[in-house]
């Protein structure tokens, strides 16, 4: 079994009509399950538009998605991210046979750092870093803001 453990960020699921990191990883590293770790802001985005689950379903319709709602309101503070470490440790222990993919490209810089450290600390993990389509910052491309915009970007995704 291959499991993608991933935070979500504003570039997910799509930005500027291109895959965000989560979708890119699923296209190139098919997984059986996705464990989606959400901070409070991303929980609200998912609740409003189902953007992450819709995006995942658009590229991997048969994958199982488990959503972990952390309630974290300050993801820029390392001390708030122990919940992510604990969630991964629990999932890792629950699936001792799994191959793990870790998305180190989504979320705040602090979340990305924690994800990279998890990849170093646990065997059977592979850290996956996804560059932006422009190979530089995504500042010029706005993230999805409405469900209609999400559907348009998913349908026209390059």
Give the location of each predicted region:
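Long, low-complexity, Lys/Arg-enriched
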Residues: 1-101, 109-158
């Amino acid at each position: 079994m291959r499991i993608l453990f991933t935070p979500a960020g504003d570039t997910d699921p799509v930005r500027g009509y291109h895959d965000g990191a989560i979708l890119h990883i699923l296209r190139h590293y098919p997984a059986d399950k996705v464990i989606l770790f959400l901070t409070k802001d991303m929980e609200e985005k998912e609740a409003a538009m189902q953007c992450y689950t819709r995006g995942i379903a658009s590229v991997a319709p048969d994958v199982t998605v488990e959503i972990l709602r952390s309630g974290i309101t300050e993801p820029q503070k390392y001390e708030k991210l122990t919940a992510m470490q604990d969630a991964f440790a629990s999932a890792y222990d629950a699936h001792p046979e799994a191959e793990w993919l870790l998305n180190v490209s989504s979320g705040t810089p602090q979340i990305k750092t924690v994800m990279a450290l998890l990849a170093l600390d646990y065997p059977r993990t592979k850290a996956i870093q996804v560059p932006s389509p422009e190979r530089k910052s995504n500042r010029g491309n706005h993230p999805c803001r409405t469900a209609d915009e999400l559907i348009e970007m998913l349908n026209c995704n390059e």
